[in-house]
UniProtKB/Swiss-Prot annotation:
Gene3D superfamilies assigned to the protein according to its UniProt record, in alphabetical order: Ribosomal protein L33
Coiled coil regions, renumbered to chain: none
Source superkingdom: Bacteria
Keyword Zinc-finger recorded: no
Name this polypeptide is given: Large ribosomal subunit protein bL33
Gene name of this polypeptide: rpmG
GO biological process, one term: translation
Family the UniProt entry places it in: Belongs to the bacterial ribosomal protein bL33 family.
Pfam families (UniProt xref): Ribosomal_L33
Keyword field contains Ribosomal protein: yes
Keywords: Ribonucleoprotein, Ribosomal protein
HAMAP family assigned: Ribosomal_bL33 (MF_00294)
Length: 53
């Protein structure tokens, strides 16, 4: 059974947490980085994975 890890995606520029998602930590152990829309910056910026507390 796959172990899903809850993660937050944080804007690389303004450091605001905009997205919550899950990932399979066993298949993808590396940190996730996606180009997503940031409400505060009002443009698409790279969002990096942070741990959910």
């Amino acid at each position: 059974m796959a172990i899903k890890k809850s993660i937050r995606l944080e804007c690389g520029e303004c450091k605001e947490i905009n997205y919550l998602t899950f990932k399979n930590a066993k298949k993808h152990p590396e940190k996730l980085e996606l180009n997503k829309y940031c409400k505060r910056c009002r443009s698409a910026k790279p969002h990096k994975e942070t741990k959910k507390k």
